[in-house]
């Protein structure tokens, strides 16, 4: 049973999430729209599976904080416009490790959050980072998120990208399907592709893909966030 301070504790936890996300957005402006999208994509997948309540909210927090380790990456590397050197990419790879350490330092012990932060760049064939895990060694939530993160990277607005909206989305889904098994969890790909083809992700792909039109995820309070994720 929850004690009398449970509601206040939840509010404090949410405040920590928003504070950290605001710090990430301040360091890397492109993060704001990305955070909205990956949170909403993950919620769509989990709700389709019937996940509700606390687990859904924890997953939302984990998705919002998945890149918290980037706070420890030097700005000249994080915001570098050109190709990263091998040494610079090794620094980037450490953001999952430092992000996990930040969560532990905050006494976060929920596996959903920790697994998202630590393992979201792992791939089914062991080619991911930082631990090169294989298959079911990777927690389910991180396997889901790998699909989402890849889709978002391939469909987010970029000055050099000619395809946007469904043109980009169709290509991204085709690539994920091609990588199903070797790179991406088949169940995760199938579910995400079904949601996409049924139009259930359209509002995220379209409305939430214009960072200039969105408030930073970390600047929205819980009540407004709840309204936003129910559109």
Model-based region annotation:
Residues 1-4:
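Juxtamembrane or sensor-core-proximal signal-transducing alpha helices
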Residues 7, 11-231:
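Metal-dependent catalytic cores of enzymes that make or break cyclic nucleotides
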């Amino acid at each position: 049973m929850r004690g009398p301070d449970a509601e206040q504790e939840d509010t404090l936890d949410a405040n920590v999430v928003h504070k950290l996300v605001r710090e990430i957005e301040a360091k890397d402006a492109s993060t704001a729209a990305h955070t909205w999208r990956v949170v909403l994509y993950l919620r769509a997948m989990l709700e389709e599976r019937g996940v509700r309540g606390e687990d859904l909210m924890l997953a939302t927090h984990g998705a919002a904080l998945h890149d918290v380790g980037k706070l420890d990456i030097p700005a000249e590397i994080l915001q570098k416009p050109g190709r990263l050197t091998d040494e610079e990419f090794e620094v980037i790879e450490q953001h999952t490790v430092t992000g996990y350490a930040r969560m532990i330092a905050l006494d976060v012990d929920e596996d959903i959050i920790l697994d998202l932060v630590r393992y979201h760049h792992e791939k089914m064939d062991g080619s991911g980072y930082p631990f090169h895990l294989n298959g079911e060694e990777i927690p389910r939530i991180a396997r889901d998120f790998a699909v989402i993160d890849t889709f978002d990277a391939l469909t987010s607005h970029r000055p050099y990208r000619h395809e946007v909206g469904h043109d980009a989305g169709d290509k991204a889904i085709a690539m994920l399907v091609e990588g199903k098994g070797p790179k991406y969890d088949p169940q995760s790909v199938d579910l995400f592709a079904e949601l996409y083809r049924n139009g259930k992700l359209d509002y995220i792909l379209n409305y939430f893909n214009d960072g200039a039109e969105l408030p930073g995820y970390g600047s929205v309070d819980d009540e407004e966030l709840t309204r936003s994720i129910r559109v």
